[in-house]
Design a protein with these regions (language model features):
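Active-site neighborhood of HAD-like aspartate-dependent phosphohydrolases
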Residues: 54-102
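Short acidic-hydrophobic, aromatic-tinged amphipathic segments that line or gate anion-handling sites
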Residues: 262-266
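Short hydrophobic alpha-helical segments enriched in small aliphatic residues
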Residues: 7, 13, 22, 26, ...
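Non-catalytic pre-domain segments flanking phosphatase-related domains
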Residues: 25, 36-66
Length: 274
């Protein structure tokens, strides 16, 4: 492991030998099941570290604040369909899936400003934006689903007593609707775009601060998880450690260019950070 020659030993995981510790130290799974007493193949040096693992428990996070689109849910098809419905009704050219992928992340108004020719300066913009919202309110779940491994991750976090919340630049109605459909057993709060109430959208810290208040935790006790440059900036502005996911709407190089330092390829890897 790590290029070093360590003697390998096969041990049974103790009750207090957390799975997060196993993942954190890159321990290789020996038997593929979820029994906490399963055997793991680890180095002797790493096994000796298990006595230190108990001390890590004291520094664990108490909460996770999630972005929604591209992080918990694949929503791109429904966003594209709503965009193209509105554009078509207004006699405007439709957009491809890749174009819509590039447009999302800053809220649906900016999505439509990018999709509509001449943006907000187009005389038909407000009408087209209203058509988008009308369509999306009804069709926000036609082709939407959680990413593979998300529901299992949320269940594990719940078992561990980790509190969770969603903050999204998506329309608040849609955020709460999707939360109720998929995550009602897990989320303490689900907060969407609420600028009319004086809560600025991401990357301003307002939404995260509201979530932390509802969770009853401080910024040091929570981590932020998202898939975009907006999420990286949001975490920084809110004083939270950021974990960037690679399965969302932005690729790895883009995330790194925008300051991502903690990258995960699978939902289960988030357990390394709590």
């Amino acid at each position: 492991m790590g290029g070093m020659a360590h003697a390998k030993v096969c041990i049974h995981v103790e009750e207090d030998f957390s799975r997060a510790f196993v993942l954190k130290h890159k321990v290789k799974l020996f038997k593929n099941n979820d029994d906490r007493n399963e055997a793991y193949m680890i180095s002797k040096t790493e096994f000796e570290k298990t006595h230190i693992a108990k001390g890590e428990e004291e520094n664990r996070k108490k909460a996770v604040v999630f972005d929604l689109d591209g992080t918990l849910l694949y929503t791109l098809e429904d966003l594209k369909n709503a965009t193209n419905y509105a554009l078509k009704q207004s006699g405007m050219p439709e957009r491809t899936l890749d174009e819509v992928r590039r447009f999302v992340g800053n809220g649906v108004r900016l999505l439509m400003e990018r999709a509509v020719p001449q943006g907000a300066d187009n005389p038909k913009f407000e009408e087209t934006f209203a058509l988008f919202k009308e369509y999306y309110d009804v069709h926000c779940n036609d082709n939407t689903s959680p990413y593979d491994g998300i529901m299992e991750l949320l269940e594990e976090l719940k078992v561990r007593g980790i509190k969770m919340a969603i903050v999204s630049n998506k329309i608040d109605f849609a955020v709460k609707s999707l939360d109720k459909l998929y995550f009602k057993d897990y989320m303490t709060a689900a907060i969407g775009e609420m600028e009319e109430e004086g809560i600025r959208k991401k990357p301003a810290p307002d939404m995260v601060q509201k979530a932390l208040k509802e969770l009853g935790v401080t910024q040091d006790e929570a981590i932020y998880v998202g898939d975009s440059d907006v999420d990286i900036a949001t975490a920084k502005n809110s004083g939270l450690e950021c974990v960037s996911v690679t399965w969302g709407f932005r690729d790895v190089e883009f995330l790194k260019e925008h300051g991502a330092t903690n990258l995960i390829d699978e939902p289960v890897e988030l357990l390394n950070y709590v």
